[in-house]
């Protein structure tokens, strides 16, 4: 008879399980896309969740063409200010390095407070050879009453598409000092990858952190503990052993999240729930509805990018029948 075996509890794919350095998530890779030149990412602030009634667009579903209720996450997406752009080229080892940097004029003073070195950047012509183009954008925190921080977050977004990198450079030059909106990035019916920092849970025990089984009822001293720290040799505790420690506040990427709806700031009454969203308030700017849940607490910065591993095709539109505006306060 074979020896019964259970696969290890807790994935090693998420090591080290430590707190993220910043609440600002980092997009470390960008997919190659075809078509017209466009920005490959965007950012917003998580508001909360509600539910909608829509026509099931999945052709092979048993409810295809019928109204279904689905949960959605509301993300407030005010326009982003394009404050600069960068050109990258490959070094001898194949790594991308910055070869040129340009900044817009008449920037907000908050930008200089976060990056004072901007004033020292000399104006010069871009080089002839470069491999990648990325714009530098800043969030408009002052326009979002629901979040406490009023300092803008500054980060890069890749420019993709087109027939050459020169077209991407022209796109960056034309948008320098202007604003981009969510429609410049995506639209309802398409997929996006969501990158954010998860909710922090603090220091938690073995069972909650790894899902290991409780020890028998008659075990001495504790039950919510692992049975062993490992063998006698090797004579150290290996990192594969489940132990108590930090849980949450870690960067995670959710792939292939469908965009259900986009609305501008004139249409916020169609999404603001009665009494406001818990721990956030009312949406005042452009917003998007994303299918299902996404990582992070309300008010947290959420970044989106083009899907890296899209498996099903986009659809032209999502037919919404009803958006729940009932209070989320339990009354």
Swiss-Prot record:
Organism domain of life: Archaea
Keyword rRNA-binding in record: yes
Any coiled-coil regions, as ranges: none
Annotated GO MF terms: rRNA binding; structural constituent of ribosome
InterPro entries recorded: L3_arc_euk (IPR045077), Ribosomal_L3_dom_3_arc_sf (IPR044892), Ribosomal_uL3 (IPR000597), Ribosomal_uL3_arc (IPR019928), Transl_B-barrel_sf (IPR009000)
Alphabetic keyword roster: Ribonucleoprotein, Ribosomal protein, RNA-binding, rRNA-binding
GO CC terms of this entry: cytosolic large ribosomal subunit
Signal sequence interval, chain numbering: none
GO biological process: translation
Keyword check for Zinc: no
Stored NCBIfam families: L3_arch, PRK04231.1
HAMAP family the UniProt entry points to: Ribosomal_uL3_A
Protein family according to the UniProt entry: Belongs to the universal ribosomal protein uL3 family.
Biological role stated in the UniProt entry: One of the primary rRNA binding proteins, it binds directly near the 3'-end of the 23S rRNA, where it nucleates assembly of the 50S subunit.
Subunit structure: Part of the 50S ribosomal subunit. Forms a cluster with proteins L14 and L24e.
PANTHER family xrefs: 60S RIBOSOMAL PROTEIN L3-RELATED (PTHR11363), LARGE RIBOSOMAL SUBUNIT PROTEIN UL3 (PTHR11363:SF5)
Protein name: Large ribosomal subunit protein uL3
Protein's organism: Thermoplasma acidophilum (strain ATCC 25905 / DSM 1728 / JCM 9062 / NBRC 15155 / AMRC-C165)
């Amino acid at each position: 008879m074979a020896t019964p075996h259970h696969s290890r509890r807790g994935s090693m794919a998420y090591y080290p399980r430590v707190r993220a350095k910043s609440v600002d998530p980092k997009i470390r890779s960008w997919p190659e896309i075809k078509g017209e030149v466009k920005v490959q990412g965007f950012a917003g602030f998580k508001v909360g969740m509600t539910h909608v009634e829509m026509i099931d667009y999945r052709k092979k579903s048993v409810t295809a063409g019928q109204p279904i209720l689905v949960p959605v996450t509301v993300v407030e997406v005010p326009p982003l200010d394009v404050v600069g752009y960068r050109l990258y080229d490959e070094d001898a080892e194949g790594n991308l390095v910055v070869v040129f940097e340009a900044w817009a004029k008449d920037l907000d003073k908050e930008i200089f407070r976060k990056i004072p070195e901007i004033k020292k950047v000399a104006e010069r012509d871009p080089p002839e050879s470069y491999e990648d183009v990325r714009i530098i954008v800043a969030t408009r925190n002052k326009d979002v009453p629901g979040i406490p921080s009023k300092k803008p977050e500054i980060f890069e977004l890749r420019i993709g598409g087109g027939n050459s990198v020169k077209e991407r450079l022209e796109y960056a030059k034309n948008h320098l000092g202007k604003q981009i909106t969510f429609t410049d990035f995506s639209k309802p019916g398409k997929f996006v990858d969501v990158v954010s920092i998860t909710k922090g849970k603090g220091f938690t025990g073995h069972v909650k952190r790894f899902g290991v089984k409780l020890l028998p009822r008659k075990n001495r001293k504790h039950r919510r503990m692992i049975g062993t720290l490992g063998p006698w040799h090797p004579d150290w505790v290996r990192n594969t052993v489940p132990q108590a420690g930090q849980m949450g506040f870690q960067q995670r990427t959710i792939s292939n999240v469908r965009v259900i709806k986009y609305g501008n700031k004139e249409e916020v009454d169609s999404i603001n729930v009665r009494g406001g969203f818990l721990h956030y308030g009312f949406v005042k700017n452009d917003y998007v509805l994303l299918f299902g849940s996404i990582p992070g607490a309300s008010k947290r910065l959420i970044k989106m990018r083009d899907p890296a591993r899209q498996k099903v095709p986009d659809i032209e539109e999502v037919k919404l029948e009803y958006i729940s505006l009932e209070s989320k306060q339990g009354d």
